[in-house]
């Protein structure tokens, strides 16, 4: 949880180390486990995901969940006979696979839960995101 988005590939690497340790058994298992520990201890750190999910859960617990925008609901008739899923913009049909569209309920449409951390990976992601939004 401390490494997070600063080095997201660490999840797969540590899992591979644990799987390898399970297959090897002791005493050899200590090597991949030590490698995983050193990798995590020396990796850059980020708590941006923890902060974001914490803020999102706080809103849910405060009753700020609202209803999904109708364009994101499945296309079918709802209980009132109105069609749902209308006017959905398929992001992959747009340049850079992105289109401006409301994804959160009206009450939360301007809330930003994820904030990029100050590390190489997240700075690059932020730059990419700003570039594709134009």
Task: Set out the residue ranges of the language-model regions.
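Short beta-strand elements
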Residues: 101-103
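Terminal-proximal interaction/regulatory segments of ATP-powered molecular machines
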Residues: 1-96, 105-134
């Amino acid at each position: 949880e401390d490494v997070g988005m600063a080095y997201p590939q660490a999840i797969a690497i540590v899992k591979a180390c644990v799987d390898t340790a399970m297959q090897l058994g002791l005493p050899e298992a200590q090597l991949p486990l030590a490698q995983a520990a050193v990798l995590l201890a020396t990796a850059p750190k980020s708590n941006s995901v923890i902060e974001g999910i914490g803020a999102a859960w706080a809103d849910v617990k405060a009753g700020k969940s609202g209803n999904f925008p109708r364009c994101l609901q499945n296309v079918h008739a709802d209980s009132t006979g109105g069609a749902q899923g209308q006017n959905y913009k398929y992001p992959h049909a747009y340049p850079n696979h992105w289109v401006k569209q409301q994804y959160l309920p009206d009450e939360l449409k301007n809330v930003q839960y994820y904030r990029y951390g100050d590390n190489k990976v997240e700075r690059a992601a932020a730059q990419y995101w700003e570039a594709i939004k134009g």
